[in-house]
């Protein structure tokens, strides 16, 4: 891999793109350390210590710790993720949006523009909610209207800037910019999470108990990583045969090919969407100071918090786990239906003289692809749930409250593999052997 990286940096275009990505990520990390004027940067550090909700841990992981530091990038790209979820869901209800989605490059540009506007709106809403909810509670000393405007402006502008940086990375760098920013934010939390695990389970224990705890932690992490790699690498290849035909005096066709269908067809999207939807109500209600107490609202918020899903003393809150699993499965099917259309694939195969051995072209081919795809989606969604739930289990039973869990590993591994594929494709154009063949 080091040799391949060396070869990649020998290619001017790839080298320029990689340096651009690194430069933008440095800007992101510097921005995450710049405090908002007039804000007590220690407020959320102390507040986090008194909270049992994991929704803010999840949120803070996505911001790379910027939220607890109350930097200008405190909201990070979470408004963009939420707006993407909203737009994707609205494509079901509004045919205009659905047509845009299927209208090629022009339609995607329009949807991207709409997503930007929704992102700014959500950033403004979250900024105002945070300022109102915590401003008079110590977040903003000597709170007044002008200070509130400054905080709201900084938070909204920071989120908009990250959205712009993500789009620039996608266009001028390698990989998906938003995903890369999300990955670097998550990775930046790994050292502190490992330190938390060490202090909680190893430090102060006897040598035998400490070694056993460390071994279990490493084993769990390795198992989750292996499961993630298997999920991302699993592919079902559907064989395709092309019939021979005469073109002038030449016989064309007769070649064999295949349709690669990934086991994890939707990637990390179902996990991000499901986790964001589960966390969003908790975050908003907490920001505006409505935690629900012991009423119905309080019980609902507890059910939405993964810390309570495996709590032996309160098993009723495991209903939240059921909702989470259903959301992951739903988004897996939903997102795959957007990115892969069996009817279009079957029609294109028929037009090109292709067929699946043993399956008639047209409608039977479409039904066959739908059947295989449905099976793969379910397996992929089940795998995603297992990987995501393992850390929830240890969190609920043993109190291992860290932000770097199964969801984070899925995101990091998925983004790294996808970025490497893009680097590989750019290198193959110039006849360089790359990562994936090694």
Language-model features: locations:
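N-terminal cationic and glycine-rich segments that engage phosphates or anionic surfaces
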Residues: 1-101, 105-438
């Amino acid at each position: 891999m080091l040799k391949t990286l060396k070869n990649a940096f020998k290619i001017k275009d790839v080298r320029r793109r990689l340096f651009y990505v690194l430069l933008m990520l440095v800007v992101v990390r510097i921005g995450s350390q710049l405090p908002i004027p007039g804000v007590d940067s220690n407020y959320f550090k102390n507040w986090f210590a008194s909270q049992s909700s994991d929704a803010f841990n999840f949120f803070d992981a996505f911001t790379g710790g910027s939220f607890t530091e109350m930097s200008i990038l405190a909201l990070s790209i979470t408004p963009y993720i939420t707006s993407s979820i909203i737009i994707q869901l609205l494509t079901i209800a509004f045919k205009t949006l659905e047509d845009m989605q299927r209208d090629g490059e022009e339609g995607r540009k329009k949807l991207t523009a709409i997503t930007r506007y929704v992102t700014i709106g959500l950033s403004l809403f979250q900024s105002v909610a945070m300022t109102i909810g915590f401003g008079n509670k110590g977040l903003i000393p000597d709170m007044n209207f002008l200070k509130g405007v400054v905080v709201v402006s900084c938070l909204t502008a920071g989120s908009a800037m990250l959205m712009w940086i993500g789009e620039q990375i996608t266009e001028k760098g390698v990989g998906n910019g938003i995903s890369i920013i999300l990955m670097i934010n998550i990775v930046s939390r790994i050292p502190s999470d490992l330190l938390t695990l060490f202090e909680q389970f190893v430090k102060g224990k006897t040598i035998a108990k400490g070694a056993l705890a460390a071994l279990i932690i490493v084993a769990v992490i390795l198992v989750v990583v292996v499961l993630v790699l298997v999920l991302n690498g699993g592919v079902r290849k559907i064989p395709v045969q092309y019939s021979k035909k005469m073109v002038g005096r030449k016989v064309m066709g007769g070649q064999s090919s295949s349709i690669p269908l990934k086991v994890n067809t939707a990637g990390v999207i179902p996990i991000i969407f499901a986790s964001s939807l589960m966390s969003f109500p908790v975050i908003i209600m907490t920001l505006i100071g409505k935690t629900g107490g012991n009423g119905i609202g309080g019980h609902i918020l507890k059910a939405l918090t993964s810390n309570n899903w495996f709590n032996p003393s309160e098993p009723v809150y495991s209903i939240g786990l059921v909702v989470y699993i259903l959301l992951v499965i739903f988004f897996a099917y939903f997102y795959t239906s957007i990115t892969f259309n069996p009817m279009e694939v079957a029609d294109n195969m028929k037009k090109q003289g292709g067929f699946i051995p043993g399956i008639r072209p047209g409608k039977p081919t479409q039904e066959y692809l739908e059947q295989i795809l449905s099976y793969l989606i379910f397996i992929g969604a089940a795998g995603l749930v297992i990987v995501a739930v393992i850390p929830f289990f240890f969190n609920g039973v043993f109190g291992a409250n860290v932000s770097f869990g199964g969801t984070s590993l899925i995101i990091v591994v998925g983004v790294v593999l996808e970025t490497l594929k893009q680097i590989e494709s750019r290198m193959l154009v110039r006849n360089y052997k790359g990562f994936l063949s090694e």
